[in-house]
Design a protein with these regions (language model features):
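Hydrophobic alpha-helical segments within soluble ligand-binding/sensing domains
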Residues: 3-6, 31-37, 82-86, 102-125
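Ligand-binding cleft/hinge of the Venus flytrap
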Residues: 4-16
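Hydrophobic alpha-helical
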Residues: 8, 21-22, 27-89
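Hinge/cleft segment of the Venus flytrap/periplasmic-binding protein
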Residues: 11-12, 109-165
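A generic structural signal for alpha->beta connector loops
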Residues: 17-20, 74, 95, 143
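Structural detector of well-ordered beta-strand residues that form the stable sheet scaffold
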Residues: 50, 77-78, 96-99, 147
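Short glycine-centered helix-capping/turn motifs at secondary-structure transition points
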Residues: 70, 93, 159-162
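Short beta-strand elements at the ligand-binding edges of bilobed clamshell
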Residues: 92-104
Length: 165
């Protein structure tokens, strides 16, 4: 989560009109996302909130529901991941965009690296981040993409095809 938040803050730093008001950890509980969103919209006032950015997959739909209940559907919502509910809310326009990861690719490369460690043992006490002779990369970028109303149907179709296999 820290790296995701840092990524957003790095981008926001180039946009002086964007201000992060509060960051809260829902601790994997979507109910916390709903409750905190309700709090911000009712206690602080809808007119003072322009956007919500969700860093966990479980929070997007609950943030969207709180926004809908407060008739604040003109607020920007950026979610995380491509679960069925989130994609449906992107398609409906309640969520403006979601960041898609590649869970199958992430799993494949993770298992591949474990298999390599098993079949080609190395000294695991080495600092692979600074060792220029390390057999392992310091970081593996499996990619992300932005899903919005323009391309959401492609992701819905891809999800359905993956589930039907």
């Amino acid at each position: 989560m820290d790296e995701r938040l840092k990524g957003y803050k790095d981008v926001f730093a180039d946009h002086p009109g964007v201000k992060v008001v509060e960051v809260f950890n829902i601790k994997g509980d979507a109910g916390n996302a709903f409750d905190r969103t309700q709090h911000w919209l009712t206690e602080k006032g809808v007119e003072h909130i322009d956007a919500f950015v969700c860093l966990e997959a479980s929070s997007g739909k609950d943030v969207a529901e709180a926004v809908r209940r407060n008739n604040a559907t003109d607020r920007l919502i950026v979610a995380m991941d491509t679960d069925e509910a989130t994609l449906g809310l992107v398609k409906s326009g309640l969520i403006d965009a979601t960041i898609a990861q590649k869970p199958f690719t992430m799993t494949f490369f993770g298992l591949k690296q474990l298999d390599d460690v098993h079949h080609y043992p190395v000294d695991l006490k080495r600092d692979f981040a600074t060792d220029s002779f390390s057999p392992f990369p310091r970081f593996v970028d499996t990619g992300v993409s932005l899903v919005d109303k323009v391309n959401v149907d492609l992701y819905i179709q891809g999800r359905q095809e993956a589930q039907s296999k």
